């Protein structure tokens, strides 16, 4: 049996790699914490966090965590179908669809998420906290609010039209 995830190309973006120090009786003990975003460039994206005594082990742990956390986000013509706002704690992310040729106008962590997702044209603004982990989580909360044509037709009590939203 062929693994579906192995067939998909993976886009891996390292958001942050922190060296953490713990002071113990004999001195300082160092460990690493990695935060990554993984996507296939076609609508699937996930985030992961991993901690280990070695940086490469922390990155591997965050990769496996991100692959377990993949979710689908509907993309239409290289952008999101409509505007969404996601909040996580004090981080707030505003994401607006953009016309073809605009590019990814987003800062830091949101840019990495959009590139892993496969979005080519987007306008984004991070408000409030600039903690990269909270900004990514706010972005994923915004993705939970993205509706596709089938969901909108169902909410309105209409038949699904393929012509709705292109």
UniProtKB/Swiss-Prot annotation:
Could you cite one Gene Ontology molecular function of this protein? Answer: structural constituent of ribosome
The record describes its quaternary structure and partners as: Part of the 30S ribosomal subunit. Contacts proteins S4 and S8.
Q: What is the lineage of its organism?
A: Bacteria, Pseudomonadati, Spirochaetota, Spirochaetia, Spirochaetales
Task: Let me see what the UniProt entry remarks about domains.
Answer: The N-terminal domain interacts with the head of the 30S subunit; the C-terminal domain interacts with the body and contacts protein S4. The interaction surface between S4 and S5 is involved in control of translational fidelity.
What keywords were assigned to this record?
Ribonucleoprotein, Ribosomal protein, RNA-binding, rRNA-binding
Could you tell me which species this protein originates from? Borrelia garinii subsp. bavariensis (strain ATCC BAA-2496 / DSM 23469 / PBi)
UniProt cross-references to PANTHER family, sorted A to Z: MITOCHONDRIAL RIBOSOMAL PROTEIN S5
* Pfam families cross-referenced by the UniProt entry: Ribosomal_S5 (PF00333), Ribosomal_S5_C (PF03719)
Q: Which residues form the S5 DRBM domain?
A: 10-73
What are the recorded Gene Ontology BP terms? translation
Q: Which family does it belong to?
A: Belongs to the universal ribosomal protein uS5 family.
Q: Which GO terms describe its cellular component?
A: small ribosomal subunit
What is the role of this chain? With S4 and S12 plays an important role in translational accuracy. Located at the back of the 30S subunit body where it stabilizes the conformation of the head with respect to the body.
Database matches in Gene3D superfamilies: 3.30.160.20, 3.30.230.10
Q: What is the name listed in the Swiss-Prot or TrEMBL entry for this protein?
A: Small ribosomal subunit protein uS5
């Amino acid at each position: 049996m062929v693994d579906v995830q192995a067939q998909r190309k993976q886009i891996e973006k390292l958001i942050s790699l922190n060296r953490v120090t713990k002071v113990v009786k004999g001195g300082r003990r160092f460990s690493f914490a990695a935060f990554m975003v993984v996507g296939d460039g076609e609508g699937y994206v996930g985030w992961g966090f991993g901690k280990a005594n070695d940086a490469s082990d922390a990155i591997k742990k965050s990769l496996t965590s991100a692959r377990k956390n993949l979710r689908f986000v509907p993309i239409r013509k290289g952008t999101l179908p409509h505007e969404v706002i996601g909040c996580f704690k004090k981080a707030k992310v505003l994401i607006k669809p953009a016309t073809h040729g605009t590019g990814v106008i987003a800062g830091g962590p949101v840019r990495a998420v959009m590139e892993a997702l496969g979005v080519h044209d987007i306008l984004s603004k991070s408000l409030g906290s600039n903690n990269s982990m909270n900004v990514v989580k706010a972005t994923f909360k915004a993705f939970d609010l993205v509706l596709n044509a089938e969901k909108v037709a169902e909410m309105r009590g209409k038949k699904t039209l393929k012509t709705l939203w292109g």
